[in-house]
Amino acid sequence: MNSQELKKRQENIRNFSIIAHIDHGKSTLADRILEKTETVSSREMQAQLLDSMDLERERGITIKLNAIELNYKAKNGQDYIFHLIDTPGHVDFTYEVSRSLAACEGAVLVVDAAQGIEAQTLANVYLALDNDLEILPVINKIDLPAADPERVRQEIEDVIGLDASEAVLASAKSGIGIEAILEQIVEKVPAPSGDVDKPLQALIFDSVYDAYRGVILQVRVVNGMVKPGDTIQMMSNGKTFDVTEVGIFTPKAIGRDFLATGDVGYIAASIKTVADTRVGDTVTLATNPAAEPLHGYKQMNPMVFAGIYPIESNKYNDLREALEKLQLNDASLQFEPETSQALGFGFRCGFLGLLHMDVIQERLEREFNIDLIMTAPSVVYHVNTTDGDMLEVSNPSEFPDPTKVDSIEEPYVKAQIMVPQEFVGAVMELAQRKRGDFVTMDYIDDNRVNVIYHIPLAEIVFDFFDKLKSSTRGYASFDYEIAEYRRSQLVKMDILLNGDKVDALSFIVHREFAYERGKLIVEKLKKIIPRQQFEVPIQAAIGQKIVARSDIKALRKNVLAKCYGGDVSRKRKLLEKQKAGKKRMKAIGSVEVPQEAFLSVLSMDDESKK
């Protein structure tokens, strides 16, 4: 194709993504669009086709973004090339959403006709507006008995400020309104800007590792074109590679002769090491490089940290390789090696949130077959020492000596909770119990309220979301963003078994709750840790001060069984001998801590509040 033909082709390209709150029908709508454009045959069609991970299909959530090319013949008789970039809706995967939106010109905003706008709908709309995307509202699930499209239309106008007069009324499940959505994409989403004659600039928005072909880059070509045989260069580190194959996904990978401006596809270039590529980097040609890289993504900082250890210590290297491969297409995962006296060698990993942590743990166990122990999640604290230094601490065992600590600051989040009016009381009670500060409350319509609180992230990390869902019968929707660091009265609590600290059980707690937390955990461990041949004291300590204690009684043989009657001094001699033996044992004995003990520290919160 000459450059004139390529420019003509570019005018008929439409890049768009679908954004929605969880369960508003995003993946189903994507399925219908694939069917309507006959991208997949009816034989290959299965529900949630784009959610290719088992984990995604089981949980019914989208975790990874996917990019697919579709061909559509519009009513005006022209053929269009659509690139549908599927996005996750969950708050932990906002980063994935921002990456996919950077590769689009338009977004289809799906809102449930019965539920209306939810917290994450708003969060994703703001991301789309930040990227200057054309937003097309779609009111989905209009065939539900509880659907009220007119109320939702009004809500979209009032809450988001979008003109919803032309919003498509659709039902992805029944296939109603799909054609109207496709026509709106043709009319309203702008064609990609960019110039095919300029030097190549392609944005890497994802990458996957293939055992045979190395790292495969998923890119959006912004300027120029790339074809097999070209030598590409990464703009962040200057490394060069020879392109062996370019192509598109329809969900299956299909090779092409070239990728030109506006295209979304993949590049394979025998990139062997995972570290050579980074999501958000710009690819250019080594022979005719671009002057400057594209505006990439903002780097996401992990919010939640936890230790991951292999149960079998010889799997340590396997775990490292597995984490490197996961990091390749999950740029927000961070990890570094750490050791623990109780658990051996492992990694300290940083995650965006609890669902992210959960998903990574399941992927490690499923895809790489490694059994893991996870320690309790913690957040990044700022510790100001008496020497005037500020330390960032994410691992309780790295906390400095309490005598050297001047003050501790912890991260607070701005939590936005949308909830029906009848549950406002329950939500406020929960937020206060979690040390939240009330900020404001707005009525969205007659029945739904948007409540905003500042809450410490450490309280959200535990089980805030589960508690919120149960106290509002699942009606609340929740979104949070980091607001600021604030000074708090925090202390580090150590757990001692038989007088020895178990580093993996240490945690940070607010001074107010320290005593009851300590007491609870000690009682819980007493039930879980098996009885030994000697008595084992379990203690909770803050610095040198013991705040709670419980003893696991020793297993002992009845040494008096053979003394029928007999002299009391004979019995005493046998008991004293047993006691001396137990004492000697206790001095040299060590206590095995079962996996449940670490988990009990996690699920602590639920009982302390009953």
Curated annotation (Swiss-Prot):
One of its GO terms (cellular component) is plasma membrane. It holds the Pfam family EFG_C. One of its GO terms (molecular function) is translation elongation factor activity. GTP binds at residues 23-28, 140-143. Keywords: Cell membrane, GTP-binding, Hydrolase, Membrane, Nucleotide-binding, Protein biosynthesis. Belongs to the TRAFAC class translation factor GTPase superfamily. Classic translation factor GTPase family. LepA subfamily. Its EC number is 3.6.5.n1. Its main location: membrane. Required for accurate and efficient protein synthesis under certain stress conditions. May act as a fidelity factor of the translation reaction, by catalyzing a one-codon backward translocation of tRNAs on improperly translocated ribosomes. Back-translocation proceeds from a post-translocation (POST) complex to a pre-translocation (PRE) complex, thus giving elongation factor G a second chance to translocate the tRNAs correctly. Binds to ribosomes in a GTP-dependent manner. Residues 11-193 form the tr-type G domain. One of its GO terms (biological process) is positive regulation of translation. CDD domains: EF4_II (cd03699), EF4_III (cd16260), LepA (cd01890), lepA_C (cd03709). It is an enzyme of class 3 (hydrolase). It is a peripheral membrane protein. The keyword Nucleotide-binding applies. The lineage of its organism: Bacteria, Bacillati, Bacillota, Bacilli, Lactobacillales. It catalyses: GTP + H2O = GDP + phosphate + H(+). It is found in: Cell membrane. This is Elongation factor 4. Gene3D superfamilies: 3.30.70.240, Elongation factor 4, C-terminal domain, Elongation Factor G (Translational Gtpase), domain 3, P-loop containing nucleotide triphosphate hydrolases, Translation factors.
